[in-house]
């Protein structure tokens, strides 16, 4: 059936019992118009033109919609949208049933003409609808009916008054700051003021639906207004921040507002907060995420926080996710939304099992300019939202000056999310009253638009005059509301003591961070670990594991039934995870190929080779008290790491791990590392214990499969803000994971960066006997046995470099050389190394050996520490690659030559 025939078959066009015959004739007509009688040719030709008109209105009506408060663009090549364009007229259309326009119009309108007038008004009004790109027929049909069925936001007079007051507070706040703190940056909301009522409407609808957790992410534009009027941060606190006095004196004592602060702090328009309120019988938690100036980067963080609020992790097996528990609202800028790739990465998570949040509400605060850049230079598309079409989501463009239309857009969006659990994008089309910031003069670069913007009335005035004309309020009441806002702001301002300046020049980190990550000293019996291991190697009856894989897994019995059996890296991880789950700490591990492991080592999710069904052994740990969640991530780094960071911030009990496919690719997440993971606590008091597994080692695989850029993480390390390790022992890995898990949801929690192994995953030197797992704890340095009075040279190395040196030394033993594995690079184990060196009376030389070039790796970081330890007592030497622009050689054979030379030179004892 053709689309045109389908439209006719769905439309009650008074064909009655002859519908089937008429449809067949219509098909004949479409193939050859002369094949049907002349009277039907006329009818079918008219119907065909009507359907094309209708289709054009639905598909292109947005191009003529009244969505621009000021400076409407000049459209070129707008498709035909008028009745006359299709050789139709009023009389002809009045003779056709309204059902031909749309089946749901049949009982509403008398004829096609009346229905088309309604469609024109609807699709060319203050909301421009884009949904015909959606592939799902059910979703598209639902939107069509919802949009075309007569509907108007019905606000009674009291609600209209309340809405006007809300706008008066929004604009009055900006005007007060503009007048009293001249030139101070605040990134005003003016021009898209309706954002605040839209957020309030969303939160109210969510409360009525029982959604208890609202997660909001936004950049700096309008943020202060959202803080004060959505999270209800007191005016006194906000004005205090402009006056550089202590705002915390005005924090509500009832606990309804939670604000955290770091010791170095951040600018006021980056800060977030959490508001708790009882609304319509629902105790809601409304969170505005802290955010850096890197536009849009908070989007995946908000998604992760939302998913954490939706997941039940305090149970055995996998988490259960209830999308009704929480919802994300992400506020974008019109220049940044199409300009920043993080948005596409984040939207791609929307329907994935491991990341879905049941639909995000995206609001573009579209002031039609990015700093000084106008749309013609900012994007290659008609709208900034066009990039969202690829994700099959509806897009509503709404005039920011029509407040009631903005409310309606929210209503439809929330209904769609509830029905389909998918994202919706609302493009709030307004303008920017001032420059990018309040010190900027926009007329320097954008003189013509700003001539009109300066003449344009504010939405407060536009809506106020509308209510005056409707008789809802009087002119005097309108001005009285506006004056009342200024009075309240002045009263708040007067409460602040100008002399009460904040004085904290030292900005000391909290005492809880004075120490490194503390070892977890819990011991386990042999039988306990054997019980866990047996459970992990027990599968459902009839489950068919690939024979080749089964042989690998069966070897994991050997540490418990053979004297020389060793626990390799992957098995150590499985045992650690299982004991952590028994302790009641949930684990979430994601990354590209993480279920199996890039290097085919983990096998956390098994696949039946005959049916394809999966089985996850870590869902079946004896006495398991928390969930294990593992997902192969999409081929994304930034959004996935941001998601895991957000998840862990929201659920601090969760042991979140992101694993890079290769550590080399982690730098795609550098913004998350720089602006969130390593600095969030110092800036915002926001704690995270996210763990990174970054495969790192030089194995002849070239410059893009060798280095996780260890040097960059060490550069970010300060104030005990993280733990950075490069391990050489599977048992130390076991104890490290347990220590990290034990620190979660405490003041001691911090990120953990693991330079994880590749070839060492199966190296017997790294594998350890089971008795190293039953007791002890994480060791920051490791050494072999030695005779102190024979050692003249100490070699400090880390990770695979240590193992290479150890294996080389085993071939040519030299008691004068002592190898020391620096397992924990940050915090640097000064005390442990100093104590070791003090035991060596004949020591002459200390050498640092690394795989990486001299300007990379750990050398530049460790040098100041080692220099102090060596002082004038010993010689200090470096062995490693020379300074290089690229991390590693491209040719495997050249790699071997260079690597062997480093080892040879390092082991020479002069």
From Swiss-Prot:
Function comment: E1 component of the 2-oxoglutarate dehydrogenase (OGDH) complex which catalyzes the decarboxylation of 2-oxoglutarate, the first step in the conversion of 2-oxoglutarate to succinyl-CoA and CO(2).
Top-rank taxon: Bacteria
Catalyzed reaction equations: N(6)-[(R)-lipoyl]-L-lysyl-[protein] + 2-oxoglutarate + H(+) = N(6)-[(R)-S(8)-succinyldihydrolipoyl]-L-lysyl-[protein] + CO2
Keyword annotations: Glycolysis, Oxidoreductase, Thiamine pyrophosphate
Protein known as: 2-oxoglutarate dehydrogenase E1 component
Cysteine pairs bridged by disulfides in the record: none
PANTHER family xrefs: 2-OXOADIPATE DEHYDROGENASE COMPLEX COMPONENT E1, 2-OXOGLUTARATE DEHYDROGENASE
Key word Oxidoreductase present: yes
A cellular-component GO term for this protein: oxoglutarate dehydrogenase complex
Family to which the UniProt record says this protein belongs: Belongs to the alpha-ketoglutarate dehydrogenase family.
Any one GO BP annotation for this protein: tricarboxylic acid cycle
Principal EC category: oxidoreductase
GO MF term (any one): thiamine pyrophosphate binding
InterPro entries recorded: 2oxoglutarate_DH_E1 (IPR011603), 2oxoglutarate_DH_E1_bac (IPR023784), DH_E1 (IPR001017), KGD_C_sf (IPR042179), ODO-1/KGD_C (IPR031717), THDP-binding (IPR029061), Transketolase-like_Pyr-bd (IPR005475)
Species in which this protein is naturally found: Staphylococcus aureus (strain N315)
């Amino acid at each position: 059936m053709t689309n045109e025939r389908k439209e006719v078959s769905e439309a009650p066009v008074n064909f009655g019992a002859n519908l089937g015959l008429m449809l067949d004739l219509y098909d004949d007509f479409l193939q050859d118009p002369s094949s049907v009688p002349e009277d039907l040719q006329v009818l079918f030709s008219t119907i065909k033109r009507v359907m094309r008109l209708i289709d054009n209105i639905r598909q292109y009506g947005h191009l003529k919609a009244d969505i621009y408060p000021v400076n409407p663009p000049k459209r070129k090549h707008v498709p035909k949208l008028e009745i006359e364009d299709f050789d139709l007229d009023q009389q002809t259309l009045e003779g056709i049933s309204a059902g031909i326009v749309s089946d749901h119009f049949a009982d509403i309108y008398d004829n096609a003409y009346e229905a088309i007038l309604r469609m024109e008004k609807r699709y060319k009004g203050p909301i421009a609808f884009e949904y015909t790109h959606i592939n799902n027929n059910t979703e598209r049909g639902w939107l069509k009916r919802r949009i075309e069925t007569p509907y108007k936001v019905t606000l009674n007079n009291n609600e209209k008054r309340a809405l006007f007051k809300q706008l008066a507070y929004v604009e009055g706040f900006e005007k007060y700051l503009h007048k009293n703190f001249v030139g101070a940056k605040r990134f005003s909301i003016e021009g898209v003021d309706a954002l605040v009522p839209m957020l309030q409407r969303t939160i109210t609808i969510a409360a009525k639906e029982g959604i208890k957790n609202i997660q909001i992410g936004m950049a700096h534009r309008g943020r202060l207004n959202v803080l004060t009027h959505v999270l209800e941060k007191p005016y006194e606190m906000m004005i205090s921040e402009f006056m550089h006095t202590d705002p915390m004196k005005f924090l509500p004592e009832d606990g309804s507002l939670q604000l955290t602060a770091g010791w170095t702090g951040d600018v006021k328009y980056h800060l977030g907060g959490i508001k708790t309120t009882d609304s319509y019988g629902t105790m809601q938690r409304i969170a505005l995420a802290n955010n850096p100036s890197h536009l849009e980067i908070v989007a995946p963080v908000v998604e992760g926080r939302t998913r954490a609020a939706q997941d039940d992790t305090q149970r055995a097996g996998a988490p259960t996710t209830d999308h009704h528990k929480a919802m994300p609202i992400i506020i974008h800028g019109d220049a940044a939304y199409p300009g920043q790739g993080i948005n596409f990465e984040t939207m791609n998570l929307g329907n994935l099992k491991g990341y879905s949040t049941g639909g995000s509400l995206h609001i573009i605060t579209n002031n039609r300019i990015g700093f000084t850049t106008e749309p013609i230079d900012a994007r290659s598309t008609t709208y900034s939202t066009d990039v969202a079409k690829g994700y099959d989501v509806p897009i509503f463009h709404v005039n920011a000056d029509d407040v009631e239309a903005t409310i309606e857009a929210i209503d439809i969006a929330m209904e769609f999310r509830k029905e389909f659990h998918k994202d919706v994008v609302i493009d709030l089309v307004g303008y920017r009253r001032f420059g990018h910031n309040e010190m900027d003069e926009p007329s320097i670069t954008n003189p013509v638009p700003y001539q009109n913007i300066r003449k344009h009335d504010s939405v407060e005035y536009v809506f106020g005059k509308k209510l005056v004309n409707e008789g809802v309020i009087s002119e005097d009441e309108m001005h009285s509301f506006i004056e009342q806002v200024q009075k309240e702001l002045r009263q708040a301002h007067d409460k602040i003591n100008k002399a009460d300046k904040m004085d904290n020049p030292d900005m000391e980190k909290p005492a809880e961070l004075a120490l490194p990550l503390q070892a977890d000293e819990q011991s386990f019996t042999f039988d306990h670990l054997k019980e866990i291991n047996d459970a992990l190697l027990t599968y459902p009856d009839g489950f068919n594991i690939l024979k080749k894989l089964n042989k690998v897994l069966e070897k994991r019995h050997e540490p418990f039934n053979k004297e020389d059996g060793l626990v390799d890296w992957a098995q150590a991880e499985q045992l650690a995870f299982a004991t952590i789950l028994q302790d009641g700490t949930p684990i979430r591990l994601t990354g590209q190929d993480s279920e199996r492991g890039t290097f085919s080592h983990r096998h956390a999710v098994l696949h039946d080779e005959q049916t394809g069904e999966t089985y996850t052994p870590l869902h079946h740990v004896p006495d398991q008290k928390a969930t294990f969640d593992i997902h192969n991530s999409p081929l994304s780094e930034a959004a996935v790491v941001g998601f895991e960071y957000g998840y862990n911030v929201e659920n601090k009990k969760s042991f979140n791990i992101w694993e890079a496919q290769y550590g080399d690719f982690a730098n795609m997440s550098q913004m998350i590392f720089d602006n969130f993971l390593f600095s969030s606590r110092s800036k915002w008091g926001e704690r995270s214990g996210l763990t990174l597994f970054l495969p790192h080692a030089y194995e002849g695989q070239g410059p893009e499969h060798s280095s996780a850029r260890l040097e960059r993480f060490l550069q970010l390390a300060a104030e005990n803000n993280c733990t950075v390790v490069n391990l050489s022992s599977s048992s130390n890995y076991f104890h490290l994971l347990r220590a990290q898990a034990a620190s979660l949801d405490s003041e001691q929690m911090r990120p953990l960066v693991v330079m994880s192994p590749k070839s060492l995953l199966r190296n017997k030197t790294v594998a350890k006997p089971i008795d190293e797992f039953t007791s002890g704890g994480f060791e920051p340095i490791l050494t072999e046995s030695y005779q102190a009075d024979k050692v003249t040279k100490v070699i400090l190395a880390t990770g695979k470099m240590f193992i290479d040196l150890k294996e080389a030394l085993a071939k040519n033993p030299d008691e004068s050389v002592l190898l020391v594995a620096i397992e924990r690079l940050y915090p640097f184990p000064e005390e442990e190394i100093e104590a070791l060196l003090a035991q060596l009376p004949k020591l002459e030389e200390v050498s640092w050996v690394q795989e990486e070039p001299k300007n990379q790796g750990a050398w530049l970081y460790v040098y100041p520490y080692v220099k102090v330890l060596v002082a004038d007592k010993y010689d200090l030497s470096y062995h490693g690659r020379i300074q290089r622009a690229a991390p590693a050689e491209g040719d495997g054979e050249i790699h071997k030559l260079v690597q062997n030379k480093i080892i040879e030179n390092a082991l020479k004892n002069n």
